[in-house]
Amino acid sequence: MTQTSQLLTLGNGSHALVAGSGTPVVLVPGWPESARAYDEVLPFLAARHHVLAVDPPGLGDSVESTQGYDTGSISRQLEDAVRSFMPQPIHLVSHDVGAWIAYAWAAQFPERIRSLTLLDSALPGLAPLQSFPLPPEVNVKLWQLCFNTLPELPEVLTQGRERELFEWLFQHKAQHPKRITQAKRDHYVECYSKPGAMSRGFAYYRDTAKSALQNIEFAKTKLEMPVLALGGEIGMGDRLLKSMELLAVHVEGGSIEDCGHYVMEEQPEVVSSRLLEFFERVESAQS
């Protein structure tokens, strides 16, 4: 399936890909990826919907945030930018750090979110606490959550070695790393090899303490829009669903079989099918 996307720069300087027509869908990627993480999913969605895949401030090809990297602030920046392009309520889809942003977005602007989808992520302040020492199979998936928060050291160790870091992450966090194409790997390295780009990505992790406090406050009111929570079988599995059942009224989801963390790239047809079926039911119920 092919669907041509066009490049777009939103009012806040965020880089985006846009395709299709119909009810609006916004796709938010995580780190160390970009809007292109949705390349394989976007054609399926754009056949029925008006789709915007956007790089959050400081990630991918977007400009830096001028208001910090806590997800409460980032989500407000994206809401302001997206609202001018898509004034109607949106289906919001998110992955990894993008899900941190999307949860805060939905909590602050519930009237704007027609449905919320979270893909393989653990929300700061709301995910179950881990005890030390972490089991090796857990540590290999989560170590960067602590490493990326450290001052200065991540930049010292990764400058000029962005490719080596990303290749390690893809190899160890994916069930099917080869499904992340070489062209996309090259694109991600190009994005994050630019001056200051890695620091901007690390800033999301360095602000997780602030984001966590915001999330704890947001969680006092359950989300009321339909929520789809999906984890890769060797990633979050059904733990994301169980977590979201405490945070939202109408939740469904589970685990994507034969899949790791990078769900859109590893199992694009499964993810697309689940999303389209979910959107259709939501729209039918709301019509």
Predicted region positions:
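Flexible "cap/lid" subdomain of the alpha/beta-hydrolase fold that forms the substrate-access gate
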Residues: 2-7, 14-16, 24, 37, ...
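Short beta-strand element of the alpha/beta-hydrolase
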Residues: 23-29
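The serine-hydrolase catalytic nucleophile loop
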Residues: 31-40
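Conserved phosphate-coordination/catalytic loops
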Residues: 32, 72, 266-269
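Catalytic histidine-centered segment of alpha/beta-hydrolase-like enzymes
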Residues: 259-272
